[in-house]
Amino acid sequence: MNVPAFEWRRAVPADVFVLAALYRDAALRLGPLVYTPDQVRAWASFADDEPGFRAYVLGTDTWIAERPGDARTLGFCGVSTRDGLGEVRSLYVTPPRTRQGLGGEMLRRTLERAESDGTIGFAAWVTPFSLPVFLAAGFALTQTVEAPFAGMMFERYRVERG
């Protein structure tokens, strides 16, 4: 797969609004493929929780993929680390750019950066959309659960690597 070129930089506070819009767009445009309308609304609503979304982005090592030339945001990926273990907290691609390898490349760069800082293993809770990306990156499915989010139940998958 020929992954679109992108610039890669760390997220800063000024990015939160743009990333929330990308997150909301992904939920609203992709969510109906696998979720009920109520689940889609619940998923998208997190983008409106400014303090929560700000912590989601800035409380982890989040990086942004931008299109070269105009710096249009293409996606973002964040990981937190503790005691040598990394938890991938976010992996979102703008809907017009899904299925082009961008998510896999952002995940690869995120894991590589964390490994260079001493992280030896990774885990994540993922959705039906990102599960194939994580499996392709060498993660194994270890658990499937029904868990509440914004008042709705969602099926989520636990994946681990290393």
Predicted regions and their residues:
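Conserved catalytic-core motifs of GNAT/GCN5-like acyltransferases
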Residues: 121-125, 140-158
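Conserved active-site tyrosine of GNAT-family acetyltransferases
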Residues: 134-135, 139
